[in-house]
From Swiss-Prot:
Gene designation per UniProt: RPS1B
Gene Ontology biological process terms, A to Z: translation
List of residues that carry N-acetylalanine: 2
Gene source species: Debaryomyces hansenii (strain ATCC 36239 / CBS 767 / BCRC 21394 / JCM 1990 / NBRC 0083 / IGC 2968) (Yeast)
Keywords: Acetylation, Cytoplasm, Ribonucleoprotein, Ribosomal protein
Protein's name according to its UniProt entry: Small ribosomal subunit protein eS1B
Pfam families: Ribosomal_S3Ae
UniProt entry tagged with the keyword Ribosomal protein: yes
Amino acid sequence: MAVGKNKRLSKGKKGLKKKVVDPFTKKEWFDIKAPSTFENRAVGKTLINRSTGLKNAADGLKGRVVEVCLADLQGSEDHSSRKVKLRVDEVQGKNLLTNFHGIDFTTDKLRSLVRKWQSLVEANVTVKTSDDYVLRIFAIAFTKRQANQIRKTTYAQSSKLREVRKKMIEIMQREVSNCTLAQLTSKLIPEVIGREIEKSTQTILPLQNIHIRKVKLLKQPKFDLGSLLALHGEGSTEEKGKKVSAGFKDVVLEAV
């Protein structure tokens, strides 16, 4: 039997490349919306694979955490050293409704605060808000020179530092436990808690650069769509939220 080439078998041509498919054709874009406690609600866009068969795109988006500079949310460069984390809780059409997930300082800002000849005071506490969010709050402060001080250094005694730390924890517990998560966000932006700590510790030690360094979300209550829609202004499409003033005050209802 003669053995030769089988002409029925097609041979691939040299130099023929596989067809390149753009991966972005299988993806779709969604708009991320911040809560109305921030001035600018339009955070940005994110993408995910399109819904196919039993795979729903919304399931992959829920729980996604995005990090945004607070300066972009507030429209002011004064907040450029702080980062806010927002968590996607609900998908409405092409809009992703988010909730507050945490706040932190940038690394360069933290390093710029630490200097020689002063004492560092740090405190942290785990607190539950009035709407059952469990948060861990981290505060930071530094000693400063008194008005008539001649000595170069401002190191503090350990007993004084313990008193200051105790006072910091008391103030953080009081300020956080009596407000909701949305009200706490409005307090964190203008540094209300830091100013309260500075005022209360003047008799113990003169302090400077007092900040809530970090807020970490540990536990959240069962998801409530009504509360989230109220936080976003009943699902409104407005790009602007409420501006937080520097002199934030809790709303006190008058007795009927």
